[in-house]
Amino acid sequence: MAVWHSANGKVYLPPSTPVARVQSTDEYIQRTNIYYHANTDRLLTVGHPYFNVYNNNGTTLEVPKVSGNQHRVFRLKLPDPNRFALADMSVYNPDKERLVWACRGLEIGRGQPLGVGSTGHPYFNKVKDTENSNSYITNSKDDRQDTSFDPKQIQMFIVGCTPCIGEHWDKAEPCGEQQTGLCPPIELKNTYIQDGDMADIGFGNINFKALQHSRSDVSLDIVNETCKYPDFLKMQNDVYGDACFFYARREQCYARHFFVRGGKTGDDIPGAQVGNGNMKNQFYIPGATGQAQSTIGNAMYFPTVSGSLVSSDAQLFNRPFWLQRAQGHNNGILWANQMFVTVVDNTRNTNFSISVYSQAGDIKDIQDYNADNFREYQRHVEEYEISVILQLCKVPLKAEVLAQINAMNSSLLEEWQLGFVPTPDNPIQDTYRYLESLATRCPEKSPPKEKVDPYKGLNFWDVDMTERLSLDLDQYSLGRKFLFQAGLQQTTVNGTKTTPYRGSIRGTKRKRKN
């Protein structure tokens, strides 16, 4: 007989207080059809590919570290559009609106030929090749070898109006007192990716300085560094979407060599030493006495990867990208008039070898070659050029819009001079004439407060573009590409004629006061 029972499942009720909804920038920002082109100079940097070079005292940096495996983080500073002397003042009403920039197009230009760079360590911790081993491996006190390899191939760029968020694994604080020699706990940390931070080259995104005390497990360029990787999951789920409008990446690698580490194993393979011998012969059977296998070898296996073929057929650079719809709520609006472009590209990773004759005399007078008479140097160069298409947009000064902007970044309202102005305590102030006179009181020692940079202390490649904007898009390569793809050109019998693109969305005509 069928019997009815009440539902035993939980009943979920909506929250008592409404959840604040974050609006997309497309919901409240009005776009005009005024476009600007901006580009940087040729940006060049030269340095040593593996480490900083200091003087003998270690007090002066003589040659900085410049590697193809580093992140390049460009901070493009744009002019304030609200201070522009616009020819058509009907573009916006300063009493009810503010102007902002929107990114519509981007092209990251890269110079220099394609090339593969190698990295390595003169004391690399590898015992032997474990892929094609013809004898059993035995350890000694020092099995390090001079080894080099090519890194994982990576091309990537991230565009946003705040710095890119990176992730790496670092040493964590133990819950209690930890015995010396035990593996420390590790945790995932989020930090901003700064200019010069190393990218992952095949050994993971960890703090090698804190987690590898032997200083021989990785190559020279990262042995004293922290390799970071963009935290795409965090940036894609950001409520405002300022750190990453869009990105492009291409990574590839394969395991080229297989080695094993030297040293004492920290985590022994479970065997007869566990418990009362209940794990005996579970993972291996010991070798006979007198055999090389009587002492078990290390199981710390690892590969050295290779980035494989570098080809011009798979390049992300030297080509335009158009932003129609960003992945987050911010559809390309450049708050605070700045733009962050984070780039990694090691497909142009050639390291120059420079040899210098260290003896007196000319090279033509050398009788016999002697390697001791020549000094070998290494240098790496990077070449960039960035072009952007900017669109002029209007932000209405409405209560709901200002409330969201204030919650997102209250300093924007201060820059727009919309902050709260308190009522003066005294309508008249005291002003002395002779401030340097001994008969007059000392002036106020507190200096005026300067604007605090929210990214003070972080290292970026600052590029000033306040005077590099142009309305003549057809005079630039990226501008002509934008006009063509946007349909702002029309073909006539006499040639190609550009339709006006400097117009704007005209506002309501103001009434004259009587």
UniProtKB/Swiss-Prot annotation:
GO MF annotation: an example: structural molecule activity
Signal peptide boundaries: none
GO CC list: host cell nucleus; T=7 icosahedral viral capsid
A GO biological process held by the record: endocytosis involved in viral entry into host cell
Record-annotated membrane-spanning stretches: none
Family to which the UniProt record says this protein belongs: Belongs to the papillomaviridae L1 protein family.
Keywords, ordered alphabetically: Capsid protein, Disulfide bond, Host nucleus, Host-virus interaction, Late protein, T=7 icosahedral capsid protein, Viral attachment to host cell, Viral penetration into host cytoplasm, Virion, Virus endocytosis by host, Virus entry into host cell
Protein's name in the database: Major capsid protein L1
Keyword presence, Membrane: no
Subunit architecture: Self-assembles into homopentamers. The capsid has an icosahedral symmetry and consists of 72 capsomers, with each capsomer being a pentamer of L1. Interacts with the minor capsid protein L2; this interaction is necessary for viral genome encapsidation. Interacts with protein E2; this interaction enhances E2-dependent replication and transcription activation.
InterPro entries in the record: Capsid_L1_Papillomavir, Capsid_L1_sf_Papillomavir, dsDNA_vir_gr_I_capsid
Organism: Human papillomavirus 47
Subcellular location: Virion; Host nucleus
Gene this protein is translated from: L1
Residue ranges of the region described as Disordered: 495-514
Broad class of the protein's primary localization: virion
Keyword presence, Repeat: no
Summary of the function given for this chain in its UniProt record: Forms an icosahedral capsid with a T=7 symmetry and a 50 nm diameter. The capsid is composed of 72 pentamers linked to each other by disulfide bonds and associated with L2 proteins. Binds to heparan sulfate proteoglycans on cell surface of basal layer keratinocytes to provide initial virion attachment. This binding mediates a conformational change in the virus capsid that facilitates efficient infection. The virion enters the host cell via endocytosis. During virus trafficking, L1 protein dissociates from the viral DNA and the genomic DNA is released to the host nucleus.
